């Protein structure tokens, strides 16, 4: 699946002197928490991108936000965002046709620890709505891409054609002191 990320997200466990990484962290956390300023900012950026890429043809496509841990979190994080983006970009809104049952714990993956537990977690898609539609998936973060690929497969199974994924940020990794040295060397930060 083709993917496009707006920003690069460096997890807190990595040191950085780059103010852009710090600002992106704040934006991602605020968006995930449903903060109005972050939701509005991200909606503005996404509307501008979709309008630039598709213009008047945007109405031929469906924007659907990827499922998150629970229906409550999905509604809180994405429903107003999706309604605003789709109204302003003149693209169809598929987020109201995603239902999440149960809950999935957050995925925390690193070399030493993997957590991904589900408790009756199931995502249900309205096949009548998605059948034959050209879909763009939106999510806040992409790390490995596994969650987006799983969701793409579910959409494919109900007859949708997924054109790609649009992400607020892609997780990148820094390598400690050498990473800070590279940031200074390439003038991402000046002392």
Predicted regions and their residues:
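Glycine-rich phosphate-binding loops at beta-strand->alpha-helix junctions
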Residues: 67-77
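Active-site-facing substrate-recognition patch
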Residues: 1-58, 99-131, 171
